[in-house]
């Protein structure tokens, strides 16, 4: 990436610096093209600035294109060891390691018999296969990487004279993939780029890995999930949808397909939390898309779908900040998000516009009798102020707020 088009992502760099030189493998995991490789490049520059000699930083990329004939864990181990010429510490920055069969074995050996500090990236479930628990139990930290936050998006657009609220409209429509954000693509071109990313994920990380034979049925399941972002649904609902189209798929296969999409970081599951019983419920979850542009590249932009994508933005902003995020169930009422981080908790309702009688929108929050922060987040330009302890906040302000 050209230097002038590259924006620092200090939150990720700070996390890597925090774990530097600890005897843990640092795993950066997220959907393809979300910026993991660039974060590694930036961290390499940070290491050099801190005084690490460049010849003690080993950067290797293991893409499927570069490993046409595959690579074994032994070949990976030997290849890295050959580059280590003394007993001083080496910093290993290894990109897309899941393309190496049994990469965990090689990494474990390098941890045990070499003076190393190891950082790896990956884009799919092969990164986190069952064998990682056999070889790296308690010896790795997983760092989720997401597409650009709105704050990061604004850094990409620093030369743009438009207001943050105007830029938010672009962010909603175009999403946060860095390759799109760093250039001024027209909408159609942006969606073509995102469609290419999506197809790469589906082909490389899902259909090929899991040997999906009936691609049409799989794509129909994906379509259902994308159309129902931010809505509770079940595998049975998907089965009924397929039946209405004259298709049939077992509940088990539907669960498998959803799992594959999760493991490729295309969708994220948001469970329900019973605020009365203080327990996580196992039914009627919601799913959110890794980036809003994934919906629009498949379905086209539809203003009617903006409300659900606003939820999508808030969900990932909370995830980026380290919250565990749930749908809140308070007897018969629903809270869009209950976000928990250590002993902190916040409640968030999301709506496109404030209704004339805003009490109706606030009711679900006002019925909560604890003293945790409560927000209604909206695109309404009149948002602002406080109603009985509930803060009314414009989406642009909520997404860039320093703290909640």
Question: Which residues does each PLM region occupy?
Answer:
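Pre-Walker A adenine-sensing motif
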Residues: 3-21
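Accessory nucleic acid-recognition modules appended to NTPase machines
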Residues: 185-344
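Conserved lysine of the Walker
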Residues: 36
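Interdomain motor-coupling "hinge/lid" segment immediately C-terminal to the ATP-binding subdomain
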Residues: 123-125, 129-232, 265-268
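Catalytic cores of nucleic-acid endonucleases
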Residues: 328-329, 352-396
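Short glycine-rich substrate-engagement loop in P-loop NTPases that contacts/grips substrate
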Residues: 59-88
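Hydrophobic positions on the alpha1 helix immediately C-terminal to the Walker A/P-loop
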Residues: 39
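Hydrophobic anchor at the beta1->P-loop junction of P-loop NTPases
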Residues: 28
